[in-house]
């Protein structure tokens, strides 16, 4: 091997992380911070594509992350085109399509890349996604939405028969939440694949409707003869998740998305029209009124930090007693769990706790009466979401920057 080839091999960029943003400035700051931590030991780049946000996203990026590539679109180009623009500018062997309302652990990309390198004929790798309460998001592994599979989705039959292989194909129930294996469809919130493969299949189809862009890309990769994988050992927080609001607009968008997918990849299906018509009828007949997300009244706050000044600032802001906790997260949460009936909000200080430990805590202590927020390192806000349905909550602070 020539010297120049050796240098190229050593210095070759392994991965480009593409983050498409639109008006989620605070989530974006948290996301980029976590990605930077996860890429510290990897030859890599971060490319943020902003779809003409009206908030302070671009100003924040230039101030906080001047070393990160920022592409400022003059219009909202949409999800497919925005990501395609980012990939076109990338130089990594792999690309990661990542939503801005996500948090990755420090070892996320090391694990994902090691897994990817272990596979032949690799397509796309997705990871395990949880929401801001630690609950599993089933859309991170799915099957090809044939007319019948789409029917089980819109009618909710997959919920009635959660263990059925026949009715559970939409969410790939052949794999457990904590089981790695092949799947057909992965979610656009987190996708890792070879850049060459992304370009080979044409990237995201810019004609796609909402809810079909990631399905289409995943299926194009399958048609190219590659295998897609769900990798459960990497857990990523996706705050907003797939909306569970099942209103008329959702039904229309889902139907349009499936129609686009079938028209592109299959012959015209009478079954599709029949199943979607029945599904729409049952949907309108049996749908329950969507419960309004009620903000929980927090009984007390627990701040995982040793910063006494921070405790005082949070107390003054919230107007409630804040308990400072500086012991191990797991032991402290176990003791808090024993006090049943209280609504306890946990605030994790990322200046002292790793993203990995925070993510582990979210997952381990889900559904135990806690809500969670994160204070990102050297940031002046606390952020989180108590439901994959809502827009999240940001609590602004005034904290002296280091």
Predicted regions mapped to residue ranges:
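Short, flexible, basic/aromatic active-site loop/helix in glycosyltransferases
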Residues: 144-183
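Glycine-rich, basic loop-to-helix element that forms the pyrophosphate-binding segment
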Residues: 72-90, 111
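Short aromatic/hydrophobic "clamp" motif used to bind/position activated sugar donors
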Residues: 95
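Short, well-formed alpha-helical segments that are part of the catalytic scaffolds
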Residues: 19, 24-39
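Active-site-adjacent helix/loop segment of glycosyltransferases
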Residues: 219, 223-293
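A conserved acidic beta->alpha catalytic loop
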Residues: 34, 50-59, 75
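A short, conserved alpha-helix in the catalytic core of glycosyltransferases
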Residues: 176-179, 184-234, 362-363
């Amino acid at each position: 091997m020539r010297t120049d080839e050796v240098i190229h091999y050593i210095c070759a960029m392994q991965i480009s992380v593409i983050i498409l943003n639109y008006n989620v400035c605070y989530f974006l700051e948290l996301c980029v911070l976590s990605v930077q931590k996860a890429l510290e030991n990897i030859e890599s780049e971060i490319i943020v594509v902003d779809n003409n946000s009206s908030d302070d996203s671009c100003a924040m990026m230039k101030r906080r992350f001047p070393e990160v590539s920022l592409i400022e679109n003059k219009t909202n180009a949409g999800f497919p085109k925005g990501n395609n623009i980012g990939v076109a500018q990338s130089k990594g062997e792999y690309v990661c399509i990542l939503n801005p309302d996500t948090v990755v652990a420090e070892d996320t990309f090391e694990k994902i890349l090691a897994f990817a390198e272990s596979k032949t004929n690799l397509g796309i790798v997705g990871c395990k996604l949880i929401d801001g309460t630690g609950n599993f998001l089933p859309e991170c592994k799915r099957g090809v939405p044939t007319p019948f599979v789409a029917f089980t989705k819109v009618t909710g039959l997959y919920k009635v028969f959660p263990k059925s292989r026949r009715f559970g194909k939409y969410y790939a129930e052949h794999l457990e939440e904590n089981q790695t294996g092949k799947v057909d469809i992965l979610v656009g919130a987190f996708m890792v694949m070879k850049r060459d493969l992304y370009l080979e299949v044409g990237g995201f189809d810019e004609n796609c409707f909402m809810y079909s862009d990631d399905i289409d890309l995943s299926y194009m990769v399958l048609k190219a003869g590659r295998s897609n994988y769900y990798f459960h050992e990497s857990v990523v927080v996706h705050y907003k998740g797939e909306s569970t609001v099942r209103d008329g607009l959702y039904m229309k968008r889902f139907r349009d998305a499936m129609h686009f997918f079938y028209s592109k990849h299959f012959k015209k299906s009478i079954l599709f029209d029949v199943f979607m018509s029945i599904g729409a009828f049952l949907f309108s007949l049996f749908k329950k009124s969507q419960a309004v997300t009620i903000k929980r009244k927090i009984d007390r706050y627990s701040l995982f930090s040793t910063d006494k000044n921070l405790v005082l600032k949070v107390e003054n802001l919230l107007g409630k007693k804040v308990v400072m906790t500086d012991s191990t997260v797991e032991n402290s949460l176990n003791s808090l769990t024993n006090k049943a009936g209280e609504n306890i909000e946990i605030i994790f200080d990322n200046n002292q706790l790793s993203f990995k430990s925070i993510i582990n805590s979210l997952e381990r202590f889900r559904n135990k009466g806690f809500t969670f927020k994160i204070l990102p390192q050297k940031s002046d806000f606390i952020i989180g979401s108590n439901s994959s349905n809502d827009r999240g909550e940001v609590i602004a602070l005034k904290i002296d920057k280091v």
